[in-house]
Amino acid sequence: KLALSGALVRKTGDGYYTGTWTDAYAYFFGATYNLNDQHRFQFYALGAPQRHGQNMYKLNVASLDRSFAESLEDYNADVSEIPECGRDCSGTGSSVSDEAAALLGDQQFEMYTEYKGKRHEDNLINERENFFHKPQVALNHYFDINDKMNLISSAYWSGGMGGGSGTYGSMEWDYSNVQRVVDYDATIFENDSLGASSGILRNSNNRQTTLGLLSKLNYDVSPDLKTQVGIDYRYARIYHVKTIRDLLGGDYYMTSDSEFDSDNGQGGLGDP
């Protein structure tokens, strides 16, 4: 009368390029219960909380492979002056010195529970990180009313909390590879000297809740005529908010673009 099943998966990896690590779980639990010949219930819950670093921006080809760049007929840049860093190159995953890392505080983000603590790697700043958890829970009911009629219903909840990170404010820039990337050492030292951060990392958060009810009645009028009638009801609430993820060496960030800002405009870790 009762059947149970479940699974748990753990995934970690460093990625091919600097800063493209992955850190994820996946889970599933299901149960089926036959009450009697007419009623059967099913329940399941699943989700996959995950974080991963991203490499989103194009880099000069010479910074990845100088010999390949020199072999291109239409490549006109002076490749000899562009540092070659290969797989260590990333437009969004940047190493920082021990001196700069020592000035950093915590990072903050939320995936149903608040995380406030160290970065994924002590000496690496991920400008672009994706983090999200979208669990789903459902309860299904199968009702065989008689030989010609049955009712199938499902009540469900689907959530979602997470987002992505990026820069906000005035950053210090490094142009040594022709295209610009953030100079995190310089940004951290600048923020530390000022107290008020001029450039930070922000979270662009997406938070959603969906409640639904599906119900379908099947009725066989005759061998040649089958009918169906049902309902599909759902309620959804979704909102987006930016919050301070990382002060990058400063004590606070002066904010003035939100009705939720504090009176003095000093935003701290996790504030909108």
Where in the sequence are the language-model features?
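Short glycine/proline-enriched coil/turn segments at helix->beta-strand junctions
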Residues: D37, L104-Q107, D147, S222-P223
